[in-house]
Amino acid sequence: MADYIEINSERLCDCKKGYLSCVEAREWMKNQIGVWNFNYEPRDVRDKTVHPAVFPIGLATRVIEQFTHKGELVLDPFCGSGTTLVAAQDLERNCIGIDLKQEYVDLSNSRVDNEKNGNPCKQIAVCRDARTLSEV
């Protein structure tokens, strides 16, 4: 196991410096109010026997879009089934997922491998304890 993970975190977008994300201000404000509704899509893991805490890709997508720019790094310290990694890949964000169980790390990495779409960003899950982030 490597001592460190090398992964880029530089912006790939042309957004103005100081902007929180690539989302336009009006859209960003609209997303701060009310209740978010999401429909499941075929790529979503819905089976609670696969992982007890599954959620739609759309939820991870919304949060990542709201708070990051293309090319930046997303950290999921409890990656489970890898939904955040899939959303990060869709949005051209780098992502590191961490989980205690190797079976979930394998599931996460296989979902990302299955979703390759040619973007320049990297998504990877590792089997570690999130309490030791400085060692990742």
What role is predicted for each listed range?
Residues M1-V136:
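Class I S-adenosyl-L-methionine-dependent methyltransferase catalytic core
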